[in-house]
Amino acid sequence: MTKDAEVEEFLKRVEDLDGKINKPPIVKKKPQHLSTTPIENDDTLDGNLVYKSAFNYEKSFGSKKPVGVIGLDKEDDRKFLVSEEDYKLLQKIKMEQQQQHLSERHHRHIEPVRHIIPDRHSKPIFHNEPVIVREESEDEAPPLPSRNRASSENVVKSTTSAPPLLPRRRYKDDITAKKLDVVSDNVNSSNKIKEMSSISDKNKSKPPLPEKKTFLKSLEDNKLTTSNYKDQDKGPELKPTRNVDFLESVQLKSPPQSPSKMKTIEEKHFKLNSPKKDGFIVSVLSSEENSRSSLSEKPSNEGNYHLSGGLTTKAEKKKPVVPPKKDIKLKDIELEKVDKTGKGGDGKQIEPEFQKIVLNKRTPPPVSKRKPSIPEALLKAQNLSKNTENKKSVAQSKESIDMLPKLNKKGPPVPQRKVSMPEALKKLESMKNKNSTTENVQKDNGEESEISDSEPESINNKLESVLKRANTSGQIGSKHIGHLPPRAATTGDLLSKKEPHTTQSLSHPNKSRSRGPKRKLPTKI
């Protein structure tokens, strides 16, 4: 099956689109040289940009003034008279300016090479330049790099100038040298002084011209290739010791001998004038490896170890001095026997001591109460005053009664309700019925009073009369429908019966009445 050309092109397009979508987003390249210097920022703040922009605008769009107005037109015909001194000064200044201009051309400021940091996605650049490898021989030295003119002048000056002086020694060196001279013999001290004077004379004389060195000899003198390494000081050997008492070890211990920090003068001069080795190869063969100092083996007997110089490896902990033990023989303390009977030899009962302490407390002496006589009491009774508490209470009660009307304030007057005609008619009928009932009651009461007047009043008769009055008042004042008499027909009822077709509107007695101020719900429940 061969694919069509159109299908292949379509598939290629799809693959290209997928590759573009799946690629990471392109990061914008940063500028190679960012202007982060504070000088440039200060220039912008000072307003140099504003000045430059205004100058450029005026130069491009401003009106061009003629040269004659400013006074810059040249006049070749004009001549000036100048003194001879001024003319020479002017010529001298011109010559100096020309020399400065020429020197600036020769000594231009070489800018430092800026190492450009490659971008994140950039590939490493490999310089495909051939590297020339020279076969180094022992006799021929490699060619030296070309020096600048300034560096060559400095070299010539150094050869002709006086040799460099040795660094001054510290004050401590002189003190140590004096101490060594006192200890040593007089002969040795005189020899040392002669050697020192000879060395100083040699240094003062001019050094000989440097001989031609081969490449291997120069490597010998190089500080980087050291032929012999100093033997590293191995740690002091540890020796096991017997278990010594703390006080004895302090007495036997010798004071720590501090090694002298400064070396003797002879050793220093010996190192300075030490003979050189026979070439680079011999020095390499004779060089020793920088071997590490091997640790000392762990001793079998565990215990306290000290150094050869008397110094211990670990700081010994000071043990407190323990006093010698005393042989204390404890004796059994025998307690005195107590008689259970609680009686002594005489047969008297012995009281315990704590009771005696309680009894010894101080008690106040008894005071005899004085009995007053009758005439004295009568005389003092006259001076007595009545109790005033009751009077105060009465006065307070009067004040409270006076304050009652102020506290019990009356509410606002209730507005009178307007009475309609049908209600007024109803009230009249009810009043008539009440008057008829009261008349009947009065008649009954009159009959009873006559009987009561005839008969003597007794307690039973009084009770009966009171009960009758209560019954009559209940019949009159009762609001039950059964006790009330039948209501008489009013004019309104007669009109409604005559006109059956007219629709009677519902009468709401509470709707038309004028209400007072609206009731507020209680806030504090």
Swiss-Prot record:
Which residue ranges run through the membrane?
none
Entry keywords, A to Z? Cell membrane, Cytoplasm, Cytoskeleton, Endocytosis, Membrane
Q: Composition bias, kind Basic and acidic residues: at what positions?
A: 110-122, 171-182, 201-223, 230-242, 314-325, 339-354
Q: Where is this region: Disordered?
A: 21-40, 98-262, 285-325, 339-525
Origin: domain of life = Eukaryota
List, as start-end ranges, the regions of compositional bias called Acidic residues. Answer: 447-456
Q: Where in the cell is it found?
A: Cell membrane; Cytoplasm, Cytoskeleton, Actin patch
Tell me if Oxidoreductase is a UniProt keyword of this record: no
Membrane topology note:
Peripheral membrane protein
- GO terms for CC? actin cortical patch; plasma membrane
Name-wise, this protein is: Protein BSP1
Species whose genome carries this gene: Candida glabrata (strain ATCC 2001 / BCRC 20586 / JCM 3761 / NBRC 0622 / NRRL Y-65 / CBS 138) (Yeast)
